[in-house]
Regions:
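Amphipathic alpha-helical and helix-coil boundary elements used as assembly
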Residues: 1-466
Length: 468
């Protein structure tokens, strides 16, 4: 059994000599949340009616040390609580440092940047320490943050690309980290409660994705084979697929450029959805545990007087843990853990944004692939932000047996033209030009009684149809 050290607390750079109670809830994919209760007489002058000395703690750093495992957060609320005629307590609540990424809902975009580039840019601006090493290494043609906080956008990226996401107490981890040290826990010693469970989470899925540049529709499906599961998880995976035999038909959430990317997406999607097929929950007094900790769980079987045989039931990674510490030296935690060999974690439970049609200005129509695409800049896109090369909707477009290309209406907007942009699947990452718009400086209408219909080129050549 590990030697247990006292939990220490610091708020706004001030060490707290004691506390009434401390609760810290940590979970993958989310901010961590804490509540601290302090005796009012240890902080405030006798008889205060409102917080005085502690009021300046709002927005300040909170550091908890569990004897080697450190948690860094920020206080977001301080209050004076009274009940039952007592003099009261000071309550401090707040979140992990990832809360600094909770900007207001905003829009931004990136062209030809990697997931690593995007996440590092956001965390650096917010002053959040991060360990960024996603499995998805390639540069993304276009990625859009749409009316989301910075943290919600990072959650959505983790969902779209099935990347690991959690806060380890000091760093935001994006991408599967290197395996750390393992902590041994034994039921009857460090563990007072242990539940070993399995559940039916696996489902078959299939779908398609269209790539317009080469006019290819790619089809793919989940491999329906468990990855990284222990024997209990493997059995649950197989039982689940036996229950749910009809594949769900879905579209790929990220933009796909080839068949290999689509197959990899459905594989990782199924791995993420079924990651918790086998799990354990427990109660422990081991204080060094946190989200991301690897534990080697043992049980002790009584085989005779004073004789116990210890057996390992496997190694697990903690995905959720709640710490509760009180006066004196009391401490307990409650955790959930998944097999440590799983390749992906359950993805964040966040909705995909729904993009609405919006106005933009054409910044280029010199399509390098000569496909009639344009680049546009929407009103919220500032600085170097703009779309990648996007298609233009036209009344008629295609080919024929005698016309291999450009059959139909070919009217590509000019640079500087105002256009309306829509989105396939309402996905902000899939914009296209819906049509062009006249404005107060570019349009004069159809003349008296709207009699004139005309077609005018950039050089001034005009075809007019005048109603008589």
């Amino acid at each position: 059994m590990l030697e247990q050290k006292k939990v220490t607390l610091e708020i706004a750079g001030i060490p707290m000599p004691s506390f009434v109670q401390l609760m810290l809830k940590q979970s993958i994919n989310e901010h961590h949340y804490f509540e601290i209760t302090l005796d009012i007489q240890a902080i405030e002058a006798y008889g205060v009616e409102i917080p005085e000395a502690s009021k300046d703690w709002v927005g300040k750093k909170v550091i908890m040390d569990f004897g080697g495992t450190v948690f860094v957060g920020v206080a977001t609320m301080v209050g004076l609580h009274r009940s039952g005629g007592t003099h009261g307590n000071i309550k401090v609540t707040g979140y992990s440092s990832t809360f600094l990424l909770e900007s207001d809902h905003t829009c931004a975009s990136w062209c030809n940047k990697s997931l690593s580039d995007i996440v590092k840019e956001l965390t650096d601006k917010a002053g959040v320490q991060a360990l960024v090493n996603p499995e998805t290494k390639s540069k993304l043609e276009y990625e859009c943050q749409y009316e989301e906080t910075n943290f919600r956008f990072i959650q959505r990226l983790a969902r779209q690309y099935q990347e690991w996401l959690y806060y380890d107490g000091q760093n935001l981890v994006f991408g599967k980290p290197q395996a750390g040290s393992t902590t041994k826990l034994t039921y009857g010693e460090d563990l007072s409660v242990l539940d070993v469970c399995s559940q039916t989470l696996a489902r078959p899925i299939k779908g398609s994705s269209y790539h317009s540049v080469n006019d290819q529709t790619y089809n793919g499906q989940s491999p329906d084979t468990a990855a990284g599961q222990n024997t209990l998880g493997q059995a649950a995976f197989d039982s689940s697929l036996a229950l749910f035999t009809a594949p769900a038909v879905q579209r790929a959430e990220p933009r796909i450029t080839n068949k290999g990317e689509l197959d990899a997406y459905f594989q990782r999607r199924q791995q993420s959805d079924s990651a918790a097929s086998s799990f354990i929950t427990g109660e422990s007094d081991c204080r060094i545990l946190t989200v991301g900790s690897i534990i080697d769980v043992h049980t002790a079987i009584h085989t005779g007087i004073g004789i116990h045989v210890k057996n390992s039931i496997g190694t697990y990674i903690i995905t959720e843990i709640t710490h509760v510490a009180g006066m004196g030296d009391s401490y307990q935690n409650y955790f959930t853990a998944l097999p440590s060999s799983i390749p992906t974690l359950p993805c964040p439970d966040v909705p995909l944004p729904v993009a609405h049609t919006q106005q933009a200005v054409v910044v280029s129509n010199e399509d390098p692939k000569k496909l009639g695409r344009v680049q546009v800049k929407m009103n919220w896109q500032t600085g170097p932000m703009q779309t990648s090369w996007i298609r233009v909707l036209t009344p008629d477009a295609g080919t024929s047996d005698k016309v291999p290309t450009n059959r139909g209406f070919v009217f590509i907007p000019e640079k500087g033209d105002q256009v309306m942009v829509a989105f396939r699947y309402d996905d902000p990452n899939r914009p296209f030009v819906l049509g062009s718009l006249f404005h107060g400086k570019s349009g004069t209408g159809g003349g008296s009684s709207n009699k004139t219909k005309s077609l005018t080129t950039r050089s001034g050549c005009t075809l007019s149809l005048i109603h008589i």
